[in-house]
Design a protein with these regions (language model features):
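Short, flexible hinge/linker loops that cap or flank conserved catalytic cores
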Residues: 4-7, 30, 89
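Conserved donor sugar-nucleotide recognition element shared by glycan-biosynthetic enzymes
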Residues: 48-49, 72, 155
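Dinucleotide-binding Rossmann-like beta1-alpha1 core, especially the glycine-rich loop
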Residues: 54-132
Length: 172
């Protein structure tokens, strides 16, 4: 992350300056790991991160991935204060629409996972959908799954904020 000199030795070398590599660097540095270096052939986010959608959902079908998403959304909110650099995170919530009973069954399964990790969510009726999204056309809709903490971020800004945080913790 520094062009001042080429590092000849490191205990941990992370290859790739996208959001995944920089996130790993940030988290290791924050946990107190020393002698870390990030290796990137171009600029940070010059690979696939720069054109990623930046969606931050928490509705995942598995416990571990849902927990990672929850922690990520919480991090993006804190990271701006920690680094004084914008992440571009916007917590706007989301609705997943149910057109059949099987959709509602899936929502119940996912709600159990989200309840377990402390992520707010609710299965809502068509009347409640209108309160969240007053302009939606309800034809064929039987319910929805509302996750108010979902959002989206600017992947490049988020990566750069994590890079700054990693440097603040001593990473190179």
């Amino acid at each position: 992350m520094s062009e001042d000199k080429i590092v000849s030795h490191a205990k941990v070398g992370i290859i790739g300056g996208g959001i995944m590599g920089v996130s790993l660097l940030y988290h290791l540095a924050k946990e107190g790991w020393k002698d870390l270096v990030l290796i990137e052939k171009g600029e940070l986010t010059s690979g696939s991160t720069w054109h990623a959608a930046g969606q931050c959902p928490q509705m995942m079908g598995g416990y571990n991935l849902a927990k990672i998403h929850r922690e990520s959304n919480n991090l993006y909110k804190k990271l701006e204060k920690e680094t004084e650099q914008p992440t571009g995170f916007h917590e706007c919530g989301s609705l997943r629409i149910a057109y059949k009973k099987e959709d509602l069954d899936w929502f119940k399964y996912v709600k159990g996972i989200l309840d377990n990790i402390g992520a707010p969510s609710e299965i809502i009726s068509t009347n409640e959908i209108k309160k969240v999204h007053p302009f939606i056309k309800l034809d064929g809709i039987i319910g929805a799954f509302h996750t108010p903490d979902d959002g989206h971020t600017d992947p490049t800004s988020t990566t750069n904020a994590m890079a700054k945080g990693a440097r603040n913790y001593g990473a190179k």
